[in-house]
């Protein structure tokens, strides 16, 4: 069994995928498994996926018809064998030593979920990327029956993305990404549901991940269809947040 399974949903990523994969391969983590789910790409992504798998035995490739990032992540989770799971977008990268830090924290604290800091770069109109500064929170922990404020944890750990977190795989059994969330918010829905399952979560402010927000990303789309898609995602998000808060929040929160 692998120690960590890294799931990469890939769509038309022939120019960025290798960099993302190499940022994972450079991590000092034994028994690493990388699962690339080619989500119906129409460029050379499929060829690159199989070339990488031939080059590195720890890489496994799944090819499916285009169904979106949520469906691709779900396929990857079904195939994952690692004790822990994390995610990487096909145009992002992990900082050197990030997975070792997340894993060491999980093992030292016996947490089911460890969340780190991240760096966000947003694409400008000229195509270049600019860093979007955001303050890091303070280290914090929540554990059932042992205290810790859920509200303070969310405030310190910031927006609840999946790519800067490490999850114990057994804590996620049966949990899936909501495939109705096709224009963003899917990470927030997933994490709210995950907080209903974990017994302990830890946040560390050290940056572990660099995320590139492309102007072409579906989460940045401003069409009427995209707006309606985000509105539809609010209901499952609020429902998941309500149940998570019920589990973690005491009367004082």
Residue ranges, per PLM feature:
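Glycine-rich, basic loop-to-helix element that forms the pyrophosphate-binding segment
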Residues: 64-80
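Short, acidic, metal-binding catalytic loop of nucleotide-sugar glycosyltransferases
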Residues: 22-31
